[in-house]
Regions:
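Conserved N-terminal beta1-alpha1 strand-loop-helix module at the mouth
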Residues: 1-93, 100-127, 143-146, 153, ...
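Short, glycine/charged-rich beta-strand-loop motifs at protein surfaces that mediate ligand recognition
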Residues: 138-142
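Cationic, amphipathic, low-complexity alpha-helical segments enriched
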Residues: 165-166, 170-175
Length: 176
């Protein structure tokens, strides 16, 4: 599965901190029913066995809704469970190495906060960029804010031409 432009129309990223006592599965299913077009499992506090169990359950839900399922950071888990793709940050494995490991048919997203990072991600085979946070957020303590001018510069530098298949998504950090 490759990343199509419509996959990024409503890209949800999980964070159990904001569940307010609800189950992650229920919130994800509600989101899928509401029109989410791609889901990233980003649960930094879960131990690997719990993460894998959660990932398998949510992957099955996403498949029921024909929505790509992306694993955050963990390329080995994405590979082991045949996830649709993986999203990596600047301190994770480089996109070139991720592409070698996952092959040509998986979706690879890369976080970028600068034009240089965006261009390198494109060169190394990323299918989309996650740029942000564009607005201040309380949902990610270590988020580096990206100005609107920087976002525009990234969009100009990596224009998303069909031949490059590069997509961009700004991360506004909307929470329920």
């Amino acid at each position: 599965m490759k990343c199509a432009e419509q996959d990024l129309l409503l890209y949800a990223v999980t964070d159990r901190h904001w569940l307010s006592g609800r189950s992650l599965r229920d919130v994800v299913e509600e989101s899928l029913r509401g029109g989410v077009t791609m889901l990233q499992l980003r649960e930094k506090t879960l131990a690997e066995p719990s993460f894998l169990a959660e990932a398998r359950e949510l992957q099955a839900l996403c498949r029921d809704y024909h929505v790509p399922f992306i694993v955050n950071d963990n390329v080995d888990i994405a590979l082991a469970m045949d996830a649709d793709g993986v999203h990596v940050g600047q301190s994770d494995m480089e996109a070139l190495d991720v592409r070698r490991k996952l092959g040509p048919d998986k979706i690879i997203g890369v976080s970028a906060q600068t034009v240089e990072q965006a261009l390198l991600a494109e060169k190394h085979g990323a299918d989309y960029l996650g740029v942000g946070a564009v607005f201040p957020t309380g949902s990610k303590d270590d988020a580096d804010d990206v100005s609107y001018d920087t976002l525009k510069a990234i969009c100009r530098a990596v224009p998303g031409k069909e031949e490059s298949m590069m997509r961009r998504s700004a991360l506004p950090r909307v929470v329920p």
